[in-house]
Every structure is written in C-alpha cells, then in structure tokens.
Amino acid sequence: QIWPNPVAGGPPFLFAERAERDAPFAVLSYGHGDVVRGYAAQWHAGLEPWTMVVDGDRWYGRGTADNKGQHSINLGALQQVLAVRDGQLGYTFKLLLEMGEEVGSPGLREVCEQHRDALQADLFLASDGPRVAAERPTLFLGSRGGVNFDLRIKLRPAGHHSGNWGGL
C-alpha cells in the first residue's frame, strides 16, 4: 500500500504486510528508500552513483549502505525462511518504508499515529546504523531520532586536550 504523507508536499510511505493465520506474533521492519545526492565526482574510478556495481561480495551504488542494502538483506532472509519452512514464516511480517528520512522524516509521526493499528507489532526491527566493525554484526537498542541545534562556543586562548580533563 502507498500511504500519502499527511504533511503537505511530503513524500509518501510504503506499507506491506504478510499476515499468517494464527501467527503468534508480528514483526514490524522500518527503513527508508530515499537517498542523499549522488555526488558523482566523489566516486572512485569505475564507480558511479547511478549504476549498481557488484565486485565480489561488495555492492556499490547510491543508497546501498543507507538503507537499500539492509532492505535487500532482510528481504533475502525472509525469502530463505519461506523456502525452508514450506512457504510459511510462522509470524506476521510488516514493512514500513519512508521516503523522507534524509530530510528529517516529515510526516512519520503523523502517519504512525494514523495507522497505529496496522503498525501494531511485537518486535520492531530497524536495520540502519553503524557497526562496530565490518565483519562484526552489531545490535543497537534505541538509536532513532534527530536533533538540530546551533552551537556557539567561546574558546580559551591556548590549546587544551579535548579529553575528559581538557574542559572541551
């Protein structure tokens, strides 16, 4: 389903659900499909933001690291679960994708309030964010949100260490 954005001029939301009869629980996965500008001149030789390039086990393309690659992994995992469980997940799966995350998520709160019942779930999965190391999967609990602020500082006249005792 395509849900219109309740904020005028805001991009739409995509909602999908695979409901299974007598499912003991529901999983809601969230992510975004929008990307930042391509910055074509900043890509390495042989790569560009407009063409997907697969090099061994790496994918290069606009949005592959934020957030489309994560969606590909999650949907591929669901496909594998369905394959080994005779077409059944054993739970209800819901997916909410927004198209305005890179510009502050206009309308996200409102659309979640409007569709509260449809978004009801027992587990929330958001595959977005940093990893401790590339080869080490990392689980963060509660890392969503954004803050905008202006910072004014008054520097001391000399150089100081920026650690715990430096006062910066």
Where are these regions (language model features)?
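Acidic/histidine-rich catalytic neighborhood of metal-dependent amide-processing enzymes
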Residues: 58-59, 63-142
